[in-house]
């Protein structure tokens, strides 16, 4: 039996380790990625564009790529169909992009085939398997165990060679507030993957779609794409920070403006709303939002919030922190003249 290979905490704390690299900067990491979408949505068009970009070292949507050899297993297509897509997407193609329309199954030699391919093309950066179902065999095993086992074989291969492997897969036709729950199969698939992508349209006939991205080394992102002339064009990209900011109530932005020329403000929630000229927000809601965003949005805008119960009612205290100009000055809270007794909420 092989002995466990362990690393102690001291070594991990001080020894420089190589961080995971990205084949497409900040989007596609080395390792295993699942790329999912409904049938005929245009997944193969996007995969082909990605393969062209990496094989030529040109940016994808203004994001740099790591140039290298690319293998695209188009297992639901023919060479004639691939040629037609190339005609539509490019005038020049790189000899570093390779295609195959047939392969072994995972259970009978696919990994060996990929290992042999890498011997011929050791500078490979990306392999796309389109689709997962074409390399799987029917199994009577537990569904989760089957999903996890199949995807782990591919992930282990990707990790051994420090390259990116993208497996194209489908989503279920179901409503769910979390798009990643729509990935067909069990959580054994998404749980094994280093990154998961879901391409989804609101309406089948629409030319726009959302690309949702999440992963271990990939922060959550949303891309708005438009399909035009057989190409997925980037309309808008939103990072996790930008998306979080969109959830901040508009009244808090107006509160920041309200406090811009004030060192402090003390009163009830009702008095605060009246002073701000707000008529659409009720006192209990503004109080909840002030507490919810006090350590994030309010703190980032150098506003300190305190809440207390007094004999004459509940009081809100707001104070602007020193150094509001961004000059790196003292960040200590400006003294609030009226004493308050903070309470735990």
Where are these regions (language model features)?
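Single conserved hydrophobic/aromatic residue that forms the stacking wall/gate
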Residues: 334-345
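Conserved alpha/beta core segments of nucleic-acid transaction machinery
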Residues: 216-264
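Hydrophobic positions on the alpha1 helix immediately C-terminal to the Walker A/P-loop
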Residues: 46, 50
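Conserved inter-motif catalytic segment of the P-loop NTP-binding fold
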Residues: 2-4, 10, 17-19, 23-24, ...
């Amino acid at each position: 039996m092989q002995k466990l290979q362990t690393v102690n905490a001291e070594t991990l704390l001080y020894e420089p380790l190589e961080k995971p690299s990205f084949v497409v900067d900040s989007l596609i990491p080395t390792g295993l990625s699942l790329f999912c979408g409904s049938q005929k949505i245009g997944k193969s068009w996007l995969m082909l564009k990605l393969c062209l970009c990496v094989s030529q070292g040109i940016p994808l949507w203004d994001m740099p790529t790591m140039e290298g050899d690319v293998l695209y297993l188009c297992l639901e297509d023919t060479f004639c169909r691939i040629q037609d897509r190339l005609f539509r997407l490019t005038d020049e193609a790189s000899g570093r992009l390779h295609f195959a329309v047939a392969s072994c199954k995972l259970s009978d030699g696919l990994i060996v085939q990929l290992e042999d391919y890498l011997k011929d093309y050791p500078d490979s950066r990306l392999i796309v398997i389109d689709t997962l179902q074409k390399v799987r065999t029917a199994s009577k095993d537990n569904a989760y165990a089957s999903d996890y086992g199949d995807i782990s074989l591919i992930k282990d291969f990707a990790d051994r060679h420090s390259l990116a492997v993208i497996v194209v897969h489908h989503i279920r036709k179901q409503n769910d507030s979390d798009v990643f729950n729509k990935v067909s199969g069990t959580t054994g698939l998404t749980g094994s993957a280093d990154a998961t992508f879901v391409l989804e349209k609101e309406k089948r006939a629409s030319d726009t779609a959302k690309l949702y991205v999440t992963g271990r080394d990939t922060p959550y992102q949303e891309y708005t794409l438009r399909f035009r002339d057989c190409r997925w064009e980037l309309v808008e990209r939103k990072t996790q920070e930008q998306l979080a900011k969109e959830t901040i109530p508009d009244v808090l932005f107006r509160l920041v403006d309200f406090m811009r020329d004030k060192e402090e403000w003390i009163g009830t929630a009702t008095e605060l709303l009246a002073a701000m000229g707000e008529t659409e927000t009720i006192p209990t809601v503004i109080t909840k939002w002030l507490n919810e965003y006090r350590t994030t949005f309010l703190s980032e805008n150098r506003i300190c919030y305190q809440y207390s119960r007094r004999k004459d009612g509940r009081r809100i205290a707001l104070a602007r922190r020193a150094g509001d100009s961004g000059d790196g000055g003292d960040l200590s809270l400006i003294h609030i003249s009226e004493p308050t007794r903070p309470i735990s909420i």
